[in-house]
Amino acid sequence: MILTKEQEEIINSDKLSFKINAVAGSGKTTTLLEYAKKNSHLKILYLAYNKSLQTSLLDKLKKYNLPSMHISTIHSLAYNKIEAYNYTLAHDLKNQIIENVITKHELTVNQKAYYPIPEYVALIKDLVNFYCNSSLIALDSKLIESYKKQSELGAKILELINKNETRVIEHLKTILSAMKNKVIDATHDFYLKMFYLNKKVSTNLPYDLILVDEAQDISDVMIGIVENQSCRRIYVGDSFQQIYTFRFATNALNKIDLPSYDLTQSFRFGDNYAKVLQNNLNSLYEINSSKPLKISGLEKTTLIGKNHIDFNKQFCVIARSTFGLIQQLVYFIHDKKKVYFEGGYNSYSFMNQTVYSIFYLKQKKNDKITIDEIKDFDTINELEQFAKDTKNQDYLNIIKFINTYGDNIFEINKKIKEFLVTDKKDADIIFTTTHKSKGLEYDQVIMADDFISKKEITNTKNKLSYLRVNEELNIYYVAATRAKDVIQLADLNLSYTYNENDETTSYVKSRFISKRADNKKSKELQEEWLKKNRVKKLI
């Protein structure tokens, strides 16, 4: 196997613990496995980011003779150690359950009737997730302050916290106790937190070396578990692929003070493209005072531009948001090509009970609403305001989908299912969002037009935070590094000069601003777009 100098330096390192910043497609897994092979006398734990990556690693491990290496996700490790199989588990806490627990607590403990508003329930749910992903132990005002600093909260949610801090902490304790005592289902992050808190179980794991993959997207509680060990540690990740801060992920590569190595050459695409991408993104990272990207590629040519896409061969469409993906779907579905969805069609919020319920809410057919949380709202406008206040992007995407296409959504769903295939090899077009494409690669890629650009970054009237801009640029980078041979890049508008009277910043208006457009103008824009994208007239 031919290795780069960067890879050889890591494999031959005499440092006991260190971190590796590896660009997309730079062979980080191969590097780690080669390092493990050279240190096969050690008992090694390889922490994979998720189950699918664990399966992929187990397949790669067959080529290596490493009987002393164990591959696991950190949740699987915690599940067995903490005996989480004794709990009934759920991937997510339902708002209705939180509301019921709080109402019952107030009635039995404080002897008063109390019915929390939806925004308050959403706040408690978010706080539970924050606590379970943090390394903090105490449930106190320090936790609340930390939550406020790490979350971009709207004015209404901030007001709820500031006016009700004591009650918020009390209800947070109530929900956590209900999970611990098996009154309600426990989340997977909850038993991970329980594992972290139980130092007798979570410290001194029986390994000489722990390899932590995707270190840019792990949580503080995961970092805490690894750092509590007395063995050697190696963290590997890509700082430019940190795209999960909304799940309270932390970039361990920036947080952990260890000797550092870099893998800057990608084996995925040509060096010509690597330099274009590096220069384009760095011009925007620089505006945001972010760390510059350094990346190189292979001695091959990767073609840039839609005119190079061969539509007779398989290609992949990557969008920033679910709604952006729907727009691309509507455009391509008329070509009668076979389509495939990364992660499965059902994992996208196109047509499910939530979409149906919101559609019927708009139609004022409340008797047909099946989702309890949506029953709390009288109109779709109320739900939209709630989604903006709580930054519920899933609801906002669905509302935009319904407002744009009306009852066309049923026809769109029917068309998709007509051409849907379940085997990727059979597809003419692969559809995915950036987050679902992470870790994957394609011969040909088309990026949708819903990514951030210079227009939004330089907009001082509706200024985005440093963290938001950095993550949005990272999301662009992840999508842009999926292609091997040909790519149509989303326009970064690099020549744009900010004008405070410019109203063309559609990305900001659609994703970050709560100001409602004039209904008549909005309707005209929708009609124009539908006509352009070959959809029947909006009803």
Question: Model features per residue range: what roles?
Answer:
Residues 2-12, 17-19, 165-250, 439:
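Conserved helicase NTPase motor core
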Residues 21-26, 30, 34, 38, ...:
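Conserved helicase motor core of SF1/SF2 NTP-dependent helicases
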Residues 86-177, 366-386:
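ATP-hydrolysis module of ASCE/P-loop NTPase motor domains
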Residues 1-87, 278, 481:
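P-loop NTPase Walker
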Residues 399-432, 438-444, 449-526:
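C-terminal accessory regions
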Residues 133-202, 392, 396-424:
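Conserved helicase NTPase catalytic core signature
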Residues 51-130, 335-336, 341-346:
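Conserved P-loop NTPase-based nucleic-acid remodeling module centered on helicase motor cores
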Residues 307-430, 434:
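Conserved helicase/translocase motor-coupling segment
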